[in-house]
Amino acid sequence: MEESSLEILEFDKIIDRVQEFAATIIGKEIISRLQPVDNLNYVKNKLREVSSAREILEEYGRPPFGGIRDLREIIEKADKGIVLSVKEVMDVRSTLEGVRELKKYSREIGTGIDDELQDIYSIITEKFDRLTPLKQLENEINRCIDEHGEIKDSASRKLRSIRREMDRIEGKINDKLNSIINNTRYQEMLQDKLVTIRGNRYVVPVKSSYKNTFSGIVHDQSTSGLTYFMEPMAIVKLNNRLGELKRAEEQEIYRILKKLSENIKEHTRDLSDNLEMVSLLDVDFARARFSIEIEGIEPGINDKGFINIRGGRHPLLKVKPVPIDITVGNEFKTLVITGPNTGGKTVALKTVGLFVLMVQAGLHIPAEEETVISIFNGVYADIGDEQSIEQNLSTFSSHINRIKRFLGKADARSLVLLDEIGVGTDPREGAALGVAILEHLRERGVTTIATTHYSEIKSYAYSQDGVENASVEFDMETLQPTYRLLMGIPGGSNAFEIALKLGLPHDIIKDGKELMSGDDIKVENIISDLNEERKKYEQLKIEIEERLEAVKKKEQKYDSLLTDLEKRKKKLITEAREEALQIIKKTRKESKEILRRLKNKEFASRSDIDRVENEINLNLKETEKEISEKRQNKDGRTRVKEISCGDQVRLKKTGQKGEVISVDREKGEAVIQAGIMKVTTGLDEVAKIDIPDDTKDELFHSYQVKKKSRVSPTLDLRGERYETAQHKLDKYLDDVFLAGLKQVEIIHGKGTGALRKAVHTVLEKNPHITSYRLGRQEEGGSGVTIADLKS
């Protein structure tokens, strides 16, 4: 790419913005070197990396890049066998910890997601997978160096021994010094009762008048000359020994650092690979964070010269820009943009050029999803005099010099951007030269976008195949540009209309129009007609879109109704067949189960069993009759009488009879006590029956009387599992209800409270229970629940 064009389009400012989001030194360096690339596959991969990193960012937050250090010089030193400093070893440890944290972060990515998202994430997670934690090396460094950069005593036995001896010697020195400074014999000689160090030797401050009297060696003198810092002779040998130990300590620390450096040398390849991969990940996530900031998207890309920007917004403008739509490179390769000054022509030109550069550098752009950008081998921009987009300074000579350079390089895979082509000289000559330049570029197949004020260039764009007009819209009511870009419509000068609205006399405006050439008038009339047609078209488009939306909604409504009808039809047919085949089979199976359970109950007499068996046979006949009735019913439904608590009903599917315990009209459900079983069913699945009062509950009460003496008022669930306890409690409540007990005691123990919760969950839902509470202290406290049953 041409350097001057990158500067004109302010690509460097984009790079600076992206760089701010990088967390590592190497990542920032890589971003600073980003350049547009004209390889289609490379660009595709880079854009996908940004999209993948952005998905991860928005779902899992920012990766922990903290702690990563620039180890390039350290690795180079280690490879050469140079002993590393403590700080350098700590930088290695910090980076190892950072890599480990990044691996931990990556393990959370993509758990429990669909394959499509997994594929998106994998573009980045594959890089995380290539990171190699060096836990053994990290542990060894941690064993030797603490968080403050001090070599630990545990780094070696010898170091521990040396430091113990140093502590012992220092203790002796302190004892002797304390005895000296606290001795009345020396107090007159000492300037102060303190101990200090000079030249790694312990000394005391002696008055200058006593320097020859005090027994010791002078190591330093105060600035005033009144104090001499002297090492008492009593500790000279101890200080000498301490010095020897400190030198031994330094030698041992050097040996430890040398060994650590050798360990690091063994892993320099892994360290380099990790550093490279972390830096690349840092760049990916920096570009992703930039994408989020500018509300960017991954555009479609091609290498055919086709650009189709939808809702494009220049990323460097401080004020929120008006989104632009702009197309070039498909049906036409040259686009001419016209319109008023400060109307947005130059911004549109720069937006296109900068978008191309950003995409080719692997960056998202602030636009709508439908946007398509082409890859070019060269972008050549002549916009102003290499000024910022807020300025519009140029000279004819600077324009021509740049255009001459472009013409020598541009080909069918190039993008040329020309701002105010032909400006800076005689308008007629400038316009003619502008047309000639555009025609030359068109013939060479160069994708070109140019801005102009010249009517001749507008006419050229209107009449020449492969060239299209566009304009920035101007609001004649407010006399302000709207900054909207209108494709296919050239922009008028609007000079006469603006002058008229501003109050210039009509006769002056009339004279001005008469002075215009015939061609100019023709062009302005064409532009005026086109703008009128555009307004009609836009209004018609709005009406058509509204009608299409209304039709679409109706189609959706009718499709939904048709689908529902088809489903209902199939469902009714299926239900009818299934009921005919299954209902009797199910009824017989349930009836046999009831009989089996009755026979297994000690309280059930032979007459009870016979009575139930006769009732089941009767119900089977009624069920067969019901199936026949259902077949004759068109929608498979029957009207039911209003069901209330206490009503006697028959279950349509099984034929069983029972009593309604509770009714939930919102859900359309009822709980039925059918013999020894309770059943929850839909209100439309039961039929109300009339039974004489004297026989209504005969069978039920016969069970109740005989079972009452067999059921205990206490249930002990301690040691049971959650689900088993709930199942046992459910069955127990049925039994005690049939037995007619009014209150029961459920023992669940205190423990963790899980079993108590299970018991209370069952009691809350059971229709037989009126209330429940934890036991009083004398009843067992919170380890027991007392439940009251309905009468």
Swiss-Prot record:
Residues 715-790 form the Smr domain. ATP binds at residues 339-346. Its EC number is 3.1.-.-, 3.6.4.-. It is an enzyme of class 3 (hydrolase). PROSITE patterns: SMR. The keyword Endoplasmic reticulum does not apply. Keywords: ATP-binding, DNA-binding, Endonuclease, Hydrolase, Nuclease, Nucleotide-binding, RNA-binding, rRNA-binding. Coiled coil: none annotated. GO terms for biological process: mismatch repair; negative regulation of DNA recombination; rescue of stalled ribosome. GO terms for molecular function: ATP binding; ATP hydrolysis activity; ATP-dependent DNA damage sensor activity; endonuclease activity; mismatched DNA binding; ribosomal large subunit binding; rRNA binding. Pfam families: MSSS, MutS_V, Smr. Endonuclease that is involved in the suppression of homologous recombination and thus may have a key role in the control of bacterial genetic diversity. Acts as a ribosome collision sensor, splitting the ribosome into its 2 subunits. Detects stalled/collided 70S ribosomes which it binds and splits by an ATP-hydrolysis driven conformational change. Acts upstream of the ribosome quality control system (RQC), a ribosome-associated complex that mediates the extraction of incompletely synthesized nascent chains from stalled ribosomes and their subsequent degradation. Probably generates substrates for RQC. Homodimer. Binds to stalled ribosomes, contacting rRNA. NCBIfam families: mutS2. Belongs to the DNA mismatch repair MutS family. MutS2 subfamily. This is Endonuclease MutS2. It comes from Halothermothrix orenii (strain H 168 / OCM 544 / DSM 9562).
